[in-house]
Amino acid sequence: MIKRIQDRDEKQKIARQVLEGLTEWFEVEESREGYISDCKDWIFFAAEEDGHYAGFLCLKETGKETVELAVMGVLKEYHRNGIGRQLVEKAKEEAASLGYSFMQVKTVKMGVYEDYDRTNRFYLACGFKEFEVIETYWDEANPCQIYVMSLA
């Protein structure tokens, strides 16, 4: 079940639980802690399975008509069960109902790391379209792929 979380402390607790279980994607502690800290101020959705949280997704406004899928994680034992897609669908519905026209997401470009190749394929399967690659957005070893989606 996907639900929107409003409580700031609960948002951080869920984010910490999930992100600390996904160190392949969130191995840099400083970045991980940044997401955990910042998520309290973002639109936050959590996936609950069997009485505990299996994943979450956060949206942040990046423009008058655009939100960014700022961070998302689903615990590995729940991968390939549709939870990520459910989170994205709920985020799309909510963003559209709030009047946003576009959603974007940033990830490491396809072809750099196998784990991120799976992430890229997931975003494409959810309906995101390739927008731009910024080779040095993060650093040269991690070129940034930006995907966008119309919510109209």
What spans do the regions from the language model cover?
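Conserved acetyl-CoA binding element of GNAT-fold acetyltransferases
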Residues: E65-K76, R80, Q104-K106
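Conserved acetyl-CoA-binding loop-helix of GNAT-fold acetyltransferases
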Residues: R80-S97, R118-R121
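Short glycine/proline-centered loop/turn elements that form peptide/ligand docking sites
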Residues: E114-T119, V133-P143
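Conserved active-site tyrosine of GNAT-family acetyltransferases
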Residues: Y123, F128
